């Protein structure tokens, strides 16, 4: 009997805790969705130096990494925009997302790539993600400022919003430095 209980406990222990995980898009699919006119995507590695990281900090943006992979969308050699993927913690699980940035530095589109939380999946709804379109540069990107919260998804909304703000700031710094 004890062996059966021990085996049952072991079986439960190895079952993934995230039974609600859903993958919606790959990073490549998201890039093509955001820039359908692109005929090529070039991945550039952008490394922020200490001064740039301090600039982000001064803007109230917490840089989780100094190195970022940025997809440059091109058509006939001309740059159309940029796509950056990232992951943030929702409540307890990771949310993978991608942000398309237009040449003027504004958000073109936000896509949720994977969502693993049991609640708060409403952040994937187009109406919520559309709030980011056109934001960037001098416009505030924050819950309560110009991005509405979703009841029951407060942490997911807040963390994805913080992530979008971070990506907008990182791309702006990289462009100022001539890295993009």
What positions do the PLM features span?
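N-terminal signal peptide c-region/cleavage motif recognized by signal peptidases
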Residues: 14-16
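Bacterial N-terminal signal peptides that target proteins for export
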Residues: 1-7
